[in-house]
């Protein structure tokens, strides 16, 4: 059973930078299920420069997936803030799936807790809905429509972000968008639903 345990710890060294740093600086590693030789090997691997490079390559691959599926969210936050949040997310959350959709949705959950930015919730809601609509499903499985509530006119906000421009001072008016996958791709039906409710302003994070 030590081989399976060794492989699990080796995988953690690649994905958990804090664990890798502790072992690389001589901290006692996990003892359960490992021989003394295996523990020494893991400590040597943790200190090897090549392992950190491998971890950076994996993080870069994950960042590329997030940029692909969340381009409007990246445009809203800006490339620097988006990359910084992606780095924090990768440090906290090990790779959960090879599927782009799963990674992007988990990153949205991270952003929802980490960031407070005007337009962010509705833009992420829209991109999450697009991911769900395009997600591969088994043959015959239903693909439910997606509902997104915007507090600003999406006809103004989304085109600005698509051009790489951040929306500013867009009038608040609630819209409800219903998206569904048709024969020619994703279609949206958008209706104004009256003024958006006023909220106390919160400091951006």
Go through each PLM region and give its residues:
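N-terminal, charged low-complexity regulatory/assembly segments
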Residues: 1-139
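Hydrophobic packing positions characteristic
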Residues: 87-202
């Amino acid at each position: 059973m030590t081989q399976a345990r060794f492989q699990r710890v080796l995988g953690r060294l690649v994905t958990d930078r804090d664990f890798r740093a502790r072992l690389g600086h001589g901290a006692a590693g996990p003892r359960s299920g490992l021989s003394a030789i295996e523990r020494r090997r893991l400590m040597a691997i943790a200190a090897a420069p090549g392992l950190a490079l491998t971890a950076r390559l994996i993080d870069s691959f994950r960042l590329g997936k997030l940029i692909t599926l969340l381009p409007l969210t990246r445009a809203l936050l800006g490339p620097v803030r988006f990359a910084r949040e992606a780095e924090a997310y990768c440090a906290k959350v090990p790779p959960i799936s090879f599927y782009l959709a799963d990674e992007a949705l988990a990153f949205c959950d991270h952003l929802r807790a980490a960031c407070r930015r005007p337009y962010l919730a509705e833009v992420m809601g829209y991109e999450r809905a697009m991911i769900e609509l395009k997600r591969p499903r088994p043959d015959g499985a239903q693909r439910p429509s997606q509902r997104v509530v915007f507090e600003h006119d999406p006809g103004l906000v989304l085109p600005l972000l698509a051009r790489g421009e951040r929306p500013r001072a867009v009038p608040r008016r609630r819209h409800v968008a219903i998206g569904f996958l048709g024969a020619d791709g994703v279609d949206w039906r958008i209706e104004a639903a009256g003024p958006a409710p006023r909220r106390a302003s919160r400091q951006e994070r």
